[in-house]
Amino acid sequence: FLAKKVAKTVAKQAAKQGAKYVVNKQME
């Protein structure tokens, strides 16, 4: 089902953003 695929893509993007946020926090 398409919605499931979209949800998975969104989750992957969110994880990528979250990882970037964590790295930026550790850099400070």
Swiss-Prot record:
GO terms for molecular function: toxin activity. Coiled coil: none annotated. The modification Glutamic acid 1-amide is found at E28. Keywords: Amidation, Secreted, Toxin. InterPro entries: Cupiennin. GO terms for cellular component: extracellular region. It is found in: Secreted. The keyword Hydrolase does not apply. The keyword Secreted applies. Its main location: secreted. GO terms for biological process: defense response to bacterium. Expressed by the venom gland. Belongs to the cationic peptide 04 (cupiennin) family. 01 subfamily. This is Short cationic peptide-1a. It comes from Cupiennius salei. The lineage of its organism: Eukaryota, Metazoa, Ecdysozoa, Arthropoda, Chelicerata.
